[in-house]
Amino acid sequence: GITTAVWAGIMENPIKEAIMKGAAFAKENECDFIIALGGGAVLDSSIAIAAMATNEGDLWDYVCGGTGKGKPLAQKGLPIVTIATTAGTGSEINCWGVISNLETKEKIGFGNPTLTPVLAIVDPELMLTVPAKYTAYQGFDALFHHTEVMMSNGVNVLSETIALSAIANIAKYLPRAVANGNDLEAREHIAYGSTMAGITMQLTSTTAQHSMEHA
């Protein structure tokens, strides 16, 4: 069998201190890989924890923006398996996470292509209990990711094709998912739209409003 160790120290808008604690936990338990079960905060955190579980120093040593030192990762991070329980961020399939540093008062994206999850499980049945308000918030998050991609200077034929499909799905099915959280068909289409955002953001980029939203 597989020995497991559970760490549940992630909060909304994850902070650097939590990341370092999670990485220390992974080291102490000699984890071979990470399973990230949750919404955007958990999925974002798994990226940074996976990196710091195999690299020395502080997370901000490897952050490229702000006061980060921008050092390259010396070691490849732990493999990540993601299980999404919300539909909004698309973090289950991309290699970036947004982490806050309370000491420097910064909130910055951290990532590396080598930290892309090796497997993503996107099951809309896990999203049936998300309240209507948060279903709406998360659905608009996914929608705006795709609209940013369409406005980006880096948009290309592949990212445009995926983004337009996702926008159509979200526009059609988000009202249904908000009205009836048990509508599995609607949940499935919103999950599709969210996950595709993880792809389009990797293929293109977001715009300045993305950073403004995080701020």
Please provide the spans of the model-predicted regions.
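Short beta->alpha junction loops
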Residues: 6-16
